[in-house]
């Protein structure tokens, strides 16, 4: 089997998402840490726009290697090319819930991660210190390191608007994270993964973000260890599932899914769904920023066109279901708040 070439960074949640998935599916790969742009340019490859991590080289229609980003479609391609040890459920209704959860992991749990990493002073200091040392392909002297620390920290803190992080929303994000942790910890008392006894792509999306919250960033790490020991242990297990005997394990039927899973979805429905809808409305109306009331508090952020695409992709997935499967999904999501984005 030909080895994939993957380019990423250790503190990148999406890099960790894909590495864990590749190990689970037993797909061989060569991993290149740091300086992704420079490495791709040295290979005379056209840079993806934008250069998001990780980058994986896939053959294009001309049978030439192309630098590819965006973990969700990459997983679907890998699922088609490597059908063993599936991460997408066969049941269409359950597969949609999995897709929804994967999007929530990639687009909402990442708000927790980015907020803590760059809003909190101790966390930003650690990230600013470590990121230059894992990103650059050569050793940095102290002066170079300090310059890069300052540059990276300023660049990232200036991008807090992307996730809606601010002094005004900090308490809302912190409480939502704790609500999510509590529900996820409860779920792990009953089963090993989100949808049953083996992982789906949603687990890998959750893992990518939570790996940083549990391991790298000081503030959420302390919260996780105090509140959710099962989540901490789950992260350690998710790191490498290559030995899991997946063929003997099952996903849960949709009607038998855990009540804790519904609690997780309800947190997303309360917090993330209104943001998706208001952001999409702002994109359509050409607004530069928008605000919405969430759980009694005001959330204000700049318009983010990519998340409008995420909402459309969710709707496309739902509209691709049969009438019977749509009914199953609507019944499962009833009163969660998630039904409003269908």
Kindly label every feature range from the protein language model.
Residues 207-298:
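Active-site/pore-lining binding-face segments in mid-to-C-terminal subdomains
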Residues 14, 18, 173-180, 184-187, ...:
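Alpha-helical packing segments of well-folded alpha/beta enzyme cores
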Residues 106, 181-185, 239:
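Structural signal for well-ordered, non-membrane alpha-helices
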Residues 1-143, 194, 214-215, 267-342:
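GST-like domain detector, emphasizing the conserved glutathione-binding G-site
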Residues 194-214:
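GST superfamily/GST-like fold recognition
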């Amino acid at each position: 089997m030909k080895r994939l070439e993957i380019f990423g960074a250790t503190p990148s949640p999406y890099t960790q998402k894909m590495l864990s998935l590749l190990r689970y599916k037993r797909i061989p790969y060569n991993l290149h840490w740091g300086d992704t742009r420079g490495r791709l340019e040295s290979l005379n490859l056209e840079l993806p726009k934008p250069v998001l991590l990780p980058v994986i080289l896939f053959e294009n229609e001309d049978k030439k290697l192309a630098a590819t980003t965006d973990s969700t479609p990459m997983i679907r391609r890998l699922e088609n090319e490597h059908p063993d040890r599936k991460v997408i459920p066969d049941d269409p209704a359950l597969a949609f819930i999995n897709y929804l959860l994967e999007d929530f992991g990639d687009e909402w749990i990442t708000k927790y991660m980015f907020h803590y990493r760059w809003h909190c002073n101790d966390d930003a200091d650690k990230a600013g210190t470590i990121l230059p040392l894992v990103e650059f392909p050569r050793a940095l002297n102290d002066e170079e390191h300090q310059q890069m620390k300052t540059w990276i920290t300023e660049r990232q803190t200036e991008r807090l608007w992307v996730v809606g992080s601010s002094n005004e929303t900090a308490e809302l994000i912190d409480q939502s994270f704790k609500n999510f942790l509590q529900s996820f910890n409860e779920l792990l008392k009953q089963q090993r993964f989100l949808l049953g006894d083996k992982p789906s792509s949603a687990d890998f999306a959750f893992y990518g973000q939570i790996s940083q919250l549990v391991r790298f960033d000081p503030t959420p790490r302390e919260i996780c260890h105090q509140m959710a020991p099962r989540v901490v242990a789950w992260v350690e297990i998710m790191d490498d599932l290559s030995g899991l005997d997946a063929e003997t394990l099952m996903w849960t039927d949709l009607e038998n899914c855990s009540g804790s899973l519904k609690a997780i979805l309800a947190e997303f429905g309360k917090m993330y769904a209104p943001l998706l809808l208001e952001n999409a409305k702002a994109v359509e109306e050409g607004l530069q920023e928008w605000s919405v009331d969430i759980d009694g508090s005001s959330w204000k952020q700049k318009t983010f066109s990519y998340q409008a695409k995420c909402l459309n992709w969710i709707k496309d997935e739902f509209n691709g279901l049969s009438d019977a499967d749509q009914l199953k999904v609507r019944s499962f999501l009833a009163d969660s708040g998630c039904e409003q984005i269908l």
